[in-house]
UniProtKB/Swiss-Prot annotation:
It catalyses: isochorismate + 2-oxoglutarate + H(+) = 5-enolpyruvoyl-6-hydroxy-2-succinyl-cyclohex-3-ene-1-carboxylate + CO2. The keyword Magnesium applies. This is 2-succinyl-5-enolpyruvyl-6-hydroxy-3-cyclohexene-1-carboxylate synthase. Coiled coil: none annotated. It comes from Synechococcus sp. (strain CC9605). Pathway: Quinol/quinone metabolism; 1,4-dihydroxy-2-naphthoate biosynthesis; 1,4-dihydroxy-2-naphthoate from chorismate: step 2/7; Cofactor biosynthesis; phylloquinone biosynthesis. CDD domains: TPP_PYR_MenD, TPP_SHCHC_synthase. It comes from the Bacteria. The lineage of its organism: Bacteria, Bacillati, Cyanobacteriota, Cyanophyceae, Synechococcales. GO terms for biological process: menaquinone biosynthetic process; phylloquinone biosynthetic process. InterPro entries: MenaQ_synth_MenD, MenD_middle, THDP-binding, Thiamin_PyroP_enz_TPP-bd_dom, TPP_enzyme_TPP-bd. Belongs to the TPP enzyme family. MenD subfamily. The gene is menD.
Length: 561
């Protein structure tokens, strides 16, 4: 256990504050060491029995504050369950540290139980792979373990030229794996001197210039940067919008305040009415929003396009139409010479909200567009919201409008999987406090083990789960799929009582029968201050038709922008 304690304490000195622990024997030294550090208030320890769910829980916790969260698992198949969360951490640039126990080299390739080639399981999704000594980390000097911790921390945080992401530390342990209480008390009195973690140096060259005196447009995609950089990013964008007068097409995930100037509300319904010359400039921030219409619109555009990312140098332009620069918005605007301080009049906007309110009244049967329109208004201002990476994130982009800016919206669109949806939300709520999750039924069922975190934690996360139950994969209803086997091949409806499943985990729930009951149900759910489920049933076929009808009708509303 001494080596495990040395390693974990070195990570704590770098800044590790939270660790999610999964059960196992080979990982016993790490578990015991984590318990010692937790007893000394050096580490917050969370336990979880499902490694896949645990990794997503940790990823949600890391995303909430932009800090590394560690996961500890035993050896064997347990390690393979970390891959989905590692992939999402890679693509969404979130720091995650995966500590896996392993057998020593003497037990490798000889048929020993629970011994697999786990070193290679996560390689493709990780920023860095590190390994303890093959004979067991007990053979390593403290300096070597300290250096391993510092290197892992740097890589997870995005040191050098790479963005934050997942790091895999594979740690062989030789028996004996477990220590006596007396030995633990002796080890707990030891302490390591702090070792500094050097700051990364960006080393980024000059970026393409854009002319604020000429026409242009800003497309703000999902925010994918460090939490500490967000305020500077917002201020830089605010300045550019005032200087240029360019319209802003903002994704709900862009982490922008509602008073951001020049914002076009419900822009996805009005792209064809934007009054811009063919050679207008385009400033794109971060990844693409989840809009095929925007993609087609940008591909038709003939003017220069600049894509700015927040420290991620990897290619992020699936349209292949933009010059990419990874220095961040704040650094880019600082490079633009001779910017005038005068503020241009903001662009004309066509607010479709009054029209949408007549089309989507807060009464009658539940529909997905109506929920996307009303929930941002009815949920308390500044309550964070997580949107499942399926229909909810797309519906809020299209129908949510101005009120989306009242909430910091999250959605794990790095790899856009629905796996881990509930566990991710639990992790966010554990660190952010009260949070609402908007999800479909398949995404929730796919990660139903996430409900385990409702009862395993000492203080259950205050999470309000808004389940849009439309009997299967509603996202497929919006695609041009023509097959007689649509229900069984694509929609895949499941015969599961979601309220009963939640209740089996001690989670209270209610059914919302109509939109008139929504406001009272939200108030009840938020008052619980713990995980709670609201089930809202809709008809996905009817909702798909409603979306088409509203899109067509919106073309006749208002004038050219």
């Amino acid at each position: 256990m001494q080596a495990a304690l040395t390693l974990l304490e070195a990570l704590c000195l770098q800044g590790l504050k939270q660790l999610v622990l999964c059960p196992g024997s080979r990982s016993g030294p790490l578990a015991t060491a984590a318990g010692v550090l937790a007893s000394q208030a050096k580490l917050q320890l969370v336990t979880a029995i499902d490694e896949r769910s645990a990794a997503f829980l940790a990823l949600g916790m890391a995303t909430a504050h932009g800090r590394v969260v560690a996961v500890v698992t035993t050896s064997g198949t347990a390690v393979s369950n970390l891959l989905p969360a590692a992939v999402e951490a890679d693509r969404s640039c979130q720091p995650l540290l995966l500590l896996t126990a392993d057998r020593p080299v003497r037990l490798k390739n000889c048929g020993a139980n629970q011994t697999v080639n786990q070193e290679s399981f996560l390689l493709a999704a990780c920023r860095w792979f590190g390994s303890g000594a093959a004979d067991g980390i007990h053979t390593q000097a403290n300096d070597a373990l300290n250096a391993l911790a510092v290197k892992a921390w740097q890589q997870a945080q995005g040191a050098g030229t790479g963005p934050p992401g997942a790091v895999h530390l594979n740690l062989p342990f030789e028996e004996p794996l477990h220590t006596t209480l007396e030995q633990q008390q002796q080890l707990a009195s030891a302490a390591l001197p702090p070792t500094a973690c050097p700051e990364p140096s960006p080393g980024i060259g000059p970026a393409l210039r854009l002319d604020p005196e000429r026409p242009g447009v800003v497309v703000a995609g999902p925010w994918r940067g460090l939490t500490l950089s967000l305020e500077a990013h917002q201020q830089a964008l605010h300045r550019w919008l005032n200087l240029s007068g360019w319209p802003l097409l903002a994704d709900p995930l862009a982490a922008l305040p509602p008073d951001c100037p020049n914002r076009i509300e419900h822009w996805e319904l009005q792209l064809d009415r934007l009054s811009l010359p063919d050679d207008a400039q385009v400033l794109r921030l971060g990844p693409m929003p989840a809009s095929r219409r925007l993609e087609a619109w940008l591909q038709r555009h003939q003017g220069p396009q600049l894509l700015i990312t927040e420290g991620d140098p990897r290619p992020l332009d699936p349209l292949h139409t933009a010059n990419q620069w990874s220095g961040g918005m704040a650094a880019w605007i600082a490079q633009q010479p001779g910017l005038k301080q005068a503020t241009k009049p903001s662009v004309g906007t066509n607010d479709l909200s009054p029209w949408l309110e007549t089309q989507l009244p807060l009464r009658g049967a539940v529909t997905e567009p109506a929920l996307a329109y009303w929930l941002p208004q009815l949920l308390p201002e500044q309550l964070p919201v997580m949107l499942a990476a399926s229909s909810p994130v797309r519906d809020w982009l299209t129908w949510g409008g101005y009120s989306c800016g009242r909430h910091r919206c999250f959605s794990f669109r790095g790899a856009s999987g629905i796996d881990g949806t509930l566990s991710l939300a639990m992790g966010l709520a554990a660190n952010l406090g009260p949070l609402a999750l908007v999800t479909g039924d398949l995404a929730l069922l796919h990660d139903s083990n996430g409900w385990l975190h409702a009862s395993s934690a000492a203080a259950p996360p205050p999470l309000l789960v808004l389940l849009i139950d439309n009997g299967g994969g509603g996202i497929f209803q919006q695609l041009p799929i023509a097959t007689p086997g649509f229900e069984s091949l694509f929609a895949m409806p499941q015969q599961v009582d979601s309220l009963a499943l939640a209740a089996a985990h001690g989670v209270p729930g209610r059914q919302v029968a109509c939109l008139e009951d929504l406001q009272e149900a939200l108030a009840w759910g938020l008052s619980q201050q713990r995980p709670v489920l609201l089930r809202l049933c809709s008809d996905r076929g009817r909702d798909a038709v409603l979306r088409q009808q509203l899109r067509a009708a919106a073309q006749n509303e208002g004038t050219e922008l």
